[in-house]
Swiss-Prot record:
Protein name as catalogued: Small ribosomal subunit protein eS8
Source species of the chain: Sulfurisphaera tokodaii (strain DSM 16993 / JCM 10545 / NBRC 100140 / 7) (Sulfolobus tokodaii)
GO biological process: translation
The keyword Ribonucleoprotein is assigned to this record: yes
Subunit structure: Part of the 30S ribosomal subunit.
CDD domains given in the database record: Ribosomal_S8e
GO cellular component: a single term: ribonucleoprotein complex
Length: 128
């Protein structure tokens, strides 16, 4: 079933409004991409508005970690999701979103990209 993002054809009282047109394709949405920590990577391409391509990370193993001390970026394996300020349940389920604190081979890092929108996981190393 599709995700409709237009007006819901109902009045405040609960009664039905008269439809003046059918639903359009541009009003179609999709469920949130909950990027999960996994042993294998899966990246999906999806058509967006205007024929643009949206790249979504479904399962992730590695992240691009920026070290502000050395001013260099490195690819590192993600070991675990420590904390997620957006939703405490996400950390328990291993879901990575922007702002999540992840444990990598290089140390703790804070995710700066949106994996469900950008198609990659970028993070900045946190000094302890």
């Amino acid at each position: 079933m599709g995700y409709f993002q237009g007006n819901d054809f109902r009045k405040i009282t609960g009664g039905k409004k008269g439809k003046h047109r059918d639903k359009r394709k541009f009003e179609l949405g999709s469920p949130p991409t909950e990027t999960k920590l996994s042993t294998e990577e899966l990246i999906e391409k999806e058509r967006g508005m205007g024929g643009n391509i949206k790249i979504r990370v479904k399962y992730a193993t590695f992240a691009n970690i920026y070290d502000p001390q050395e001013k260099v970026s490195k690819k590192a394996k993600i070991l675990s999701v420590i904390e997620t300020p957006a939703n405490k349940e996400y950390a328990r389920r291993g879901i990575i979103v922007k702002g999540s604190i992840i444990q990598t081979e290089l140390g703790k890092a804070k995710v700066t990209s949106r994996p469900g929108q950008d198609g990659t996981i970028n993070a900045i190393l946190i000094k302890e």
